Protein backbone atom coordinates (compact mmCIF):
# COMPACT_ATOMS: atom_id res chain seq x y z
CA UNK A 1 0.00 0.00 0.00
CA UNK A 2 1.25 3.47 -0.91
CA UNK A 3 -0.08 6.79 0.37
CA UNK A 4 0.21 10.09 -1.49
CA UNK A 5 -0.90 13.59 -0.47
CA UNK A 6 -2.28 16.43 -2.52
CA UNK A 7 -2.33 19.81 -0.76
CA UNK A 8 -5.01 21.99 -2.33
CA UNK A 9 -6.58 25.35 -1.53
CA UNK A 10 -9.69 23.60 -0.19
CA UNK A 11 -7.75 21.13 1.94
CA UNK A 12 -5.45 18.15 1.80
CA UNK A 13 -6.40 15.03 -0.12
CA UNK A 14 -5.15 11.63 1.02
CA UNK A 15 -4.75 9.18 -1.89
CA UNK A 16 -4.22 5.61 -0.75
CA UNK A 17 -3.01 3.30 -3.55
CA UNK A 18 -3.85 -0.32 -2.83
CA UNK A 19 -6.39 0.40 -0.09
CA UNK A 20 -9.45 -1.74 0.62
CA UNK A 21 -12.98 -0.40 0.69
CA UNK A 22 -13.58 -2.82 3.57
CA UNK A 23 -11.37 -0.54 5.67
CA UNK A 24 -13.33 2.65 4.92
CA UNK A 25 -13.99 3.12 8.63
CA UNK A 26 -10.25 3.62 9.18
CA UNK A 27 -10.41 6.86 7.20
CA UNK A 28 -13.70 8.41 8.31
CA UNK A 29 -16.33 7.90 11.02
CA UNK A 30 -18.47 5.18 9.45
CA UNK A 31 -21.52 6.34 11.41
CA UNK A 32 -21.56 9.64 9.50
CA UNK A 33 -21.13 8.25 5.96
CA UNK A 34 -23.68 8.53 3.16
CA UNK A 35 -22.58 6.77 0.00
CA UNK A 36 -23.54 8.03 -3.44
CA UNK A 37 -23.21 4.89 -5.53
CA UNK A 38 -23.38 4.14 -9.23
CA UNK A 39 -26.35 1.84 -9.98
CA UNK A 40 -24.25 -0.95 -11.47
CA UNK A 41 -21.63 -0.76 -8.72
CA UNK A 42 -24.33 -0.91 -6.05
CA UNK A 43 -25.66 -4.08 -7.65
CA UNK A 44 -22.25 -5.72 -7.99
CA UNK A 45 -20.89 -4.72 -4.58
CA UNK A 46 -24.03 -4.63 -2.43
CA UNK A 47 -22.31 -6.44 0.44
CA UNK A 48 -19.69 -3.66 0.69
CA UNK A 49 -22.28 -0.90 1.07
CA UNK A 50 -24.96 -2.71 3.03
CA UNK A 51 -23.76 -1.27 6.34
CA UNK A 52 -24.09 2.34 5.18
CA UNK A 53 -26.81 4.76 4.22
CA UNK A 54 -26.57 5.11 0.46
CA UNK A 55 -28.16 6.77 -2.55
CA UNK A 56 -28.38 5.33 -6.06
CA UNK A 57 -27.11 8.09 -8.39
CA UNK A 58 -27.78 6.27 -11.66
CA UNK A 59 -25.07 5.58 -14.22
CA UNK A 60 -23.65 7.08 -17.39
CA UNK A 61 -23.25 10.68 -18.50
CA UNK A 62 -27.02 11.23 -18.43
CA UNK A 63 -26.81 11.07 -14.63
CA UNK A 64 -24.53 14.13 -14.56
CA UNK A 65 -27.29 16.73 -14.68
CA UNK A 66 -28.65 19.44 -12.42
CA UNK A 67 -31.90 17.51 -12.22
CA UNK A 68 -30.03 14.51 -10.83
CA UNK A 69 -28.16 16.71 -8.35
CA UNK A 70 -31.45 18.16 -7.13
CA UNK A 71 -32.87 14.67 -6.53
CA UNK A 72 -29.71 13.58 -4.72
CA UNK A 73 -29.77 16.62 -2.45
CA UNK A 74 -33.38 15.84 -1.54
CA UNK A 75 -32.33 12.29 -0.66
CA UNK A 76 -29.51 13.65 1.50
CA UNK A 77 -32.10 15.68 3.39
CA UNK A 78 -34.32 12.62 3.76
CA UNK A 79 -31.39 10.63 5.16
CA UNK A 80 -30.62 13.29 7.76
CA UNK A 81 -27.38 14.62 6.30
CA UNK A 82 -25.84 17.51 8.19
CA UNK A 83 -22.46 19.23 8.27
CA UNK A 84 -20.89 16.31 10.12
CA UNK A 85 -21.82 13.94 7.27
CA UNK A 86 -19.14 12.62 4.92
CA UNK A 87 -20.30 11.82 1.39
CA UNK A 88 -18.47 8.95 -0.31
CA UNK A 89 -18.66 8.59 -4.08
CA UNK A 90 -18.57 4.92 -5.11
CA UNK A 91 -18.24 4.26 -8.81
CA UNK A 92 -16.44 5.56 -11.85
CA UNK A 93 -15.80 9.11 -12.95
CA UNK A 94 -19.51 9.91 -13.18
CA UNK A 95 -20.26 8.88 -9.60
CA UNK A 96 -17.19 10.76 -8.34
CA UNK A 97 -18.20 13.91 -10.22
CA UNK A 98 -21.75 13.72 -8.90
CA UNK A 99 -20.66 13.03 -5.32
CA UNK A 100 -18.07 15.81 -5.30
CA UNK A 101 -20.43 18.35 -6.84
CA UNK A 102 -23.40 17.48 -4.62
CA UNK A 103 -21.27 17.46 -1.46
CA UNK A 104 -19.70 20.80 -2.41
CA UNK A 105 -23.03 22.62 -2.70
CA UNK A 106 -25.15 20.84 -0.06
CA UNK A 107 -25.31 23.03 3.08
CA UNK A 108 -22.51 25.09 1.48
CA UNK A 109 -20.20 22.11 1.59
CA UNK A 110 -19.85 18.68 3.20
CA UNK A 111 -16.69 16.65 3.53
CA UNK A 112 -16.40 13.96 0.88
CA UNK A 113 -14.17 11.20 -0.39
CA UNK A 114 -14.06 8.72 -3.25
CA UNK A 115 -13.78 4.97 -3.69
CA UNK A 116 -13.26 4.82 -7.48
CA UNK A 117 -14.23 1.53 -9.10
CA UNK A 118 -12.92 2.04 -12.65
CA UNK A 119 -9.35 2.21 -13.85
CA UNK A 120 -10.05 5.61 -15.40
CA UNK A 121 -11.34 7.04 -12.13
CA UNK A 122 -8.47 5.55 -10.12
CA UNK A 123 -5.81 7.21 -12.26
CA UNK A 124 -7.57 10.43 -13.22
CA UNK A 125 -11.17 11.37 -12.46
CA UNK A 126 -11.05 10.86 -8.68
CA UNK A 127 -7.81 12.82 -8.22
CA UNK A 128 -7.42 16.56 -8.45
CA UNK A 129 -10.54 18.20 -7.07
CA UNK A 130 -12.51 18.84 -10.26
CA UNK A 131 -16.19 18.07 -9.74
CA UNK A 132 -18.68 18.86 -12.48
CA UNK A 133 -21.92 18.08 -14.26
CA UNK A 134 -23.10 18.50 -17.83
CA UNK A 135 -25.48 21.00 -19.41
CA UNK A 136 -27.19 20.66 -22.81
CA UNK A 137 -24.75 17.95 -23.86
CA UNK A 138 -21.60 19.89 -22.95
CA UNK A 139 -19.39 17.97 -20.54
CA UNK A 140 -18.50 19.36 -17.12
CA UNK A 141 -19.50 22.90 -18.04
CA UNK A 142 -20.89 23.41 -14.52
CA UNK A 143 -18.56 22.59 -11.67
CA UNK A 144 -16.35 23.42 -8.73
CA UNK A 145 -12.77 22.91 -7.60
CA UNK A 146 -12.89 21.10 -4.25
CA UNK A 147 -10.51 18.43 -3.01
CA UNK A 148 -11.84 15.13 -1.63
CA UNK A 149 -10.57 14.34 1.85
CA UNK A 150 -9.51 10.90 0.69
CA UNK A 151 -9.37 8.65 -2.37
CA UNK A 152 -9.25 4.92 -1.67
CA UNK A 153 -7.80 3.08 -4.66
CA UNK A 154 -8.94 -0.52 -4.21
CA UNK A 155 -7.65 -2.72 -7.04
CA UNK A 156 -10.08 -5.51 -6.15
CA UNK A 157 -12.94 -3.27 -7.35
CA UNK A 158 -11.55 -3.46 -10.90
CA UNK A 159 -12.22 -7.18 -11.25
CA UNK A 160 -15.84 -6.71 -12.38
CA UNK A 161 -14.96 -4.20 -15.13
CA UNK A 162 -15.77 -5.01 -18.76
CA UNK A 163 -12.87 -4.82 -21.21
CA UNK A 164 -14.11 -1.53 -22.68
CA UNK A 165 -13.90 0.16 -19.27
CA UNK A 166 -10.37 -1.12 -18.72
CA UNK A 167 -9.44 0.31 -22.10
CA UNK A 168 -10.84 3.69 -21.06
CA UNK A 169 -8.49 3.76 -18.10
CA UNK A 170 -5.59 2.65 -20.27
CA UNK A 171 -6.19 5.68 -22.52
CA UNK A 172 -5.80 8.05 -19.57
CA UNK A 173 -2.65 6.23 -18.47
CA UNK A 174 -1.16 6.68 -21.95
CA UNK A 175 -2.06 10.37 -21.73
CA UNK A 176 -0.17 10.71 -18.46
CA UNK A 177 2.84 8.94 -19.94
CA UNK A 178 2.84 11.21 -22.99
CA UNK A 179 2.67 14.46 -21.06
CA UNK A 180 5.09 13.65 -18.27
CA UNK A 181 6.52 10.15 -17.90
CA UNK A 182 8.64 8.73 -20.76
CA UNK A 183 9.65 5.78 -18.56
CA UNK A 184 6.01 4.80 -18.08
CA UNK A 185 5.48 5.07 -21.85
CA UNK A 186 8.32 2.60 -22.39
CA UNK A 187 6.87 0.36 -19.67
CA UNK A 188 3.50 0.37 -21.46
CA UNK A 189 5.15 -0.55 -24.75
CA UNK A 190 6.42 -3.72 -23.07
CA UNK A 191 3.64 -4.38 -20.56
CA UNK A 192 0.45 -2.84 -21.93
CA UNK A 193 -1.09 -6.28 -22.44
CA UNK A 194 -0.47 -7.08 -18.77
CA UNK A 195 -2.24 -3.89 -17.71
CA UNK A 196 -5.27 -4.82 -19.83
CA UNK A 197 -5.26 -8.26 -18.17
CA UNK A 198 -5.25 -6.49 -14.76
CA UNK A 199 -2.10 -8.27 -13.64
CA UNK A 200 -1.55 -6.88 -10.16
CA UNK A 201 2.05 -5.70 -10.43
CA UNK A 202 1.39 -3.95 -13.75
CA UNK A 203 -1.71 -2.21 -12.37
CA UNK A 204 0.15 -1.12 -9.22
CA UNK A 205 3.02 0.26 -11.30
CA UNK A 206 1.00 2.38 -13.72
CA UNK A 207 -1.73 3.49 -11.30
CA UNK A 208 0.90 4.62 -8.81
CA UNK A 209 2.88 6.49 -11.47
CA UNK A 210 -0.23 8.05 -12.99
CA UNK A 211 -1.54 9.22 -9.64
CA UNK A 212 1.84 10.67 -8.68
CA UNK A 213 2.09 12.56 -11.98
CA UNK A 214 -1.38 14.05 -11.65
CA UNK A 215 -0.74 15.06 -8.03
CA UNK A 216 2.51 16.77 -9.07
CA UNK A 217 0.72 18.80 -11.76
CA UNK A 218 -2.33 19.71 -9.67
CA UNK A 219 -0.16 20.69 -6.70
CA UNK A 220 1.38 23.55 -8.70
CA UNK A 221 -1.76 24.53 -10.65
CA UNK A 222 -4.92 23.44 -8.88
CA UNK A 223 -7.27 25.74 -10.81
CA UNK A 224 -5.98 25.07 -14.30
CA UNK A 225 -4.39 28.37 -15.20
CA UNK A 226 -1.25 26.90 -16.77
CA UNK A 227 0.43 23.57 -15.97
CA UNK A 228 -2.79 21.63 -15.33
CA UNK A 229 -3.99 22.43 -18.84
CA UNK A 230 -1.50 19.82 -20.06
CA UNK A 231 -3.83 17.16 -18.62
CA UNK A 232 -6.25 18.10 -21.41
CA UNK A 233 -4.01 16.41 -23.98
CA UNK A 234 -6.30 14.55 -26.38
CA UNK A 235 -9.43 15.70 -24.58
CA UNK A 236 -10.47 18.76 -26.57
CA UNK A 237 -11.38 16.63 -29.56
CA UNK A 238 -12.39 13.68 -27.37
CA UNK A 239 -15.26 15.58 -25.73
CA UNK A 240 -16.58 16.57 -29.16
CA UNK A 241 -16.31 12.97 -30.40
CA UNK A 242 -18.25 11.67 -27.41
CA UNK A 243 -21.02 14.14 -28.17
CA UNK A 244 -21.18 13.71 -31.96
CA UNK A 245 -20.17 10.08 -32.49
CA UNK A 246 -21.57 8.45 -29.36
CA UNK A 247 -18.37 6.56 -28.57
CA UNK A 248 -16.85 5.76 -25.19
CA UNK A 249 -14.54 8.16 -23.38
CA UNK A 250 -11.52 5.88 -23.78
CA UNK A 251 -12.08 5.45 -27.51
CA UNK A 252 -12.51 9.21 -27.90
CA UNK A 253 -9.33 9.96 -25.95
CA UNK A 254 -7.37 7.53 -28.12
CA UNK A 255 -8.56 9.36 -31.24
CA UNK A 256 -8.00 12.75 -29.62
CA UNK A 257 -4.42 11.90 -28.67
CA UNK A 258 -3.64 10.74 -32.20
CA UNK A 259 -5.18 13.91 -33.65
CA UNK A 260 -3.02 16.08 -31.38
CA UNK A 261 0.02 13.95 -32.20
CA UNK A 262 -0.58 14.38 -35.93
CA UNK A 263 -0.94 18.16 -35.52
CA UNK A 264 2.35 18.11 -33.62
CA UNK A 265 3.98 16.29 -36.53
CA UNK A 266 2.39 18.62 -39.10
CA UNK A 267 3.71 21.66 -37.24
CA UNK A 268 7.22 20.27 -37.10
CA UNK A 269 7.21 19.91 -33.33
CA UNK A 270 7.42 16.12 -33.24
CA UNK A 271 9.52 13.66 -35.21
CA UNK A 272 7.97 11.01 -37.41
CA UNK A 273 9.69 8.27 -35.40
CA UNK A 274 8.04 9.39 -32.16
CA UNK A 275 4.68 9.79 -33.89
CA UNK A 276 4.92 6.18 -35.08
CA UNK A 277 5.76 4.96 -31.55
CA UNK A 278 2.71 6.73 -30.16
CA UNK A 279 0.41 5.35 -32.84
CA UNK A 280 1.82 1.84 -32.35
CA UNK A 281 1.08 1.93 -28.61
CA UNK A 282 -2.41 3.36 -29.04
CA UNK A 283 -3.34 0.79 -31.67
CA UNK A 284 -1.52 -1.98 -29.82
CA UNK A 285 -3.69 -1.44 -26.76
CA UNK A 286 -6.79 -1.72 -28.93
CA UNK A 287 -7.66 1.97 -28.91
CA UNK A 288 -8.91 3.48 -32.18
CA UNK A 289 -6.70 6.09 -33.80
CA UNK A 290 -8.83 7.18 -36.77
CA UNK A 291 -11.74 9.61 -36.41
CA UNK A 292 -15.15 8.52 -37.79
CA UNK A 293 -17.21 11.71 -37.44
CA UNK A 294 -17.69 14.40 -40.10
CA UNK A 295 -15.17 17.24 -39.82
CA UNK A 296 -17.81 19.96 -40.13
CA UNK A 297 -19.90 18.65 -37.25
CA UNK A 298 -16.79 18.19 -35.12
CA UNK A 299 -15.64 21.74 -35.83
CA UNK A 300 -18.84 23.29 -34.48
CA UNK A 301 -18.77 21.13 -31.36
CA UNK A 302 -15.06 21.59 -30.63
CA UNK A 303 -15.38 25.34 -31.08
CA UNK A 304 -17.86 25.49 -28.19
CA UNK A 305 -15.36 23.82 -25.86
CA UNK A 306 -14.84 25.64 -22.55
CA UNK A 307 -11.10 25.87 -23.30
CA UNK A 308 -11.76 28.49 -26.01
CA UNK A 309 -10.85 32.07 -25.22
CA UNK A 310 -10.27 35.28 -27.21
CA UNK A 311 -11.13 33.67 -30.55
CA UNK A 312 -8.69 30.78 -30.22
CA UNK A 313 -8.76 27.27 -28.80
CA UNK A 314 -6.07 26.08 -26.41
CA UNK A 315 -4.60 22.82 -27.66
CA UNK A 316 -1.99 20.61 -26.03
CA UNK A 317 0.61 19.30 -28.48
CA UNK A 318 3.86 17.35 -28.08
CA UNK A 319 7.49 18.14 -28.77
CA UNK A 320 8.47 14.66 -27.57
CA UNK A 321 7.18 11.99 -25.21
CA UNK A 322 7.04 13.74 -21.85
CA UNK A 323 7.33 17.23 -23.39
CA UNK A 324 3.89 18.78 -23.92
CA UNK A 325 3.40 22.33 -25.13
CA UNK A 326 0.25 24.44 -24.90
CA UNK A 327 -0.57 26.31 -28.08
CA UNK A 328 -3.56 28.07 -29.61
CA UNK A 329 -5.44 27.25 -32.79
CA UNK A 330 -7.76 29.68 -34.51
CA UNK A 331 -10.90 28.44 -36.21
CA UNK A 332 -9.36 28.26 -39.69
CA UNK A 333 -6.38 26.25 -38.46
CA UNK A 334 -8.62 23.83 -36.61
CA UNK A 335 -10.85 23.43 -39.66
CA UNK A 336 -7.83 22.70 -41.86
CA UNK A 337 -6.43 20.09 -39.48
CA UNK A 338 -9.83 18.40 -39.12
CA UNK A 339 -10.10 18.23 -42.90
CA UNK A 340 -6.52 17.11 -43.57
CA UNK A 341 -5.78 14.81 -40.63
CA UNK A 342 -9.09 13.08 -39.91
Give the ranges of each region predicted by the language model.
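Active-site segments that bind and position negatively charged phosphate/pyrophosphate groups
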Residues: 186, 191-294
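Non-catalytic interfacial helical region
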Residues: 73-90, 99-114
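C-terminal charged capping/lid subdomain of soluble metabolic enzymes
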Residues: 171-173, 270-342
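A glycine/threonine-rich phosphate-anchoring loop and its flanking beta-alpha core
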Residues: 101-194
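Short glycine/serine/threonine-rich phosphate/pyrophosphate-binding segments
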Residues: 94-101, 122-123, 240
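Glycine-rich beta-strand-to-loop/alpha-helix junction loops that act as flexible
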Residues: 59-60, 90-92, 233-234
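ATP/NTP phosphate-donor binding region
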Residues: 1-86
